[in-house]
């Protein structure tokens, strides 16, 4: 039986992010890399996360922290609401909401991730967390106020 990809694409995992996470293919752009990294969090694949972090970030030192997070976090869904990059610039950005439960509480990560392309491969560098007012529209596109949606 086929399994839908956790990235929210509505495509089978084997045809969507699995080829990137397994190393069969290299993510062709920042959005695919971000979606496949989300899948790696869901699938608890620290190796892929470390491999796709830019080498300057020293991600290998985060392995223990990743493993601890895997044990306590259940990922509930991903919504990408903005992405932009230009291959000529070798830099790209993807904005998303990732929903999760941890310790019985539901939460969300809202981030604008920055990616860098080197030697034909995209890498995650870092992300910023935009601030939203409680009465602002939720960036996930639900049409609800932030406080009634991802800001809970």
From Swiss-Prot:
For this protein, the record's Pfam families field holds:
SEC-C, YchJ_M-like
> Can you tell which superkingdom this protein's organism belongs to?
Bacteria
Q: What family does the entry list?
A: Belongs to the UPF0225 family.
The name this protein carries in UniProt is UPF0225 protein YchJ
Organism listed in the record: Shigella flexneri
